[in-house]
Amino acid sequence: MSLPEHDVTIDATDLRCPEPLMLVRNKLMDLQAGQILKVIATDPSTTRDFRDFCRFLNHRLLHSEQSEAVYSYWIEKG
């Protein structure tokens, strides 16, 4: 599977909850509907946090993956 194209990347490595979520929330406010944000994080709680965040705020979690202790997410702004 090819990874989704993205418009902006946020590096949230070494940040702990709630910092990654706040960075994503703030950056999505700057994007237009349909634009895609890639997030790189190391906090395992982001797996749950980003899934729930997208569901509640009508964004789409297009793809997520984990490699070692690094989590990557592609979020489309709703």
Each predicted region: which residue ranges?
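A broad "ordered helical/assembly scaffold" signature
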Residues: 1, 22-26, 70
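Generic serine detector
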Residues: 2, 45, 64-67, 72
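Right-handed parallel beta-helix/beta-solenoid
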Residues: 2-11
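Intrinsic-disorder/low-complexity, polar/charged segments enriched in Ser/Thr/Lys/Arg/Asp/Glu/Gln
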Residues: 7, 34-38, 70-72
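Amphipathic, hydrophobic secondary-structure cores in small proteins
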Residues: 12-65
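Core SAM-dependent methyltransferase catalytic element
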Residues: 72-78
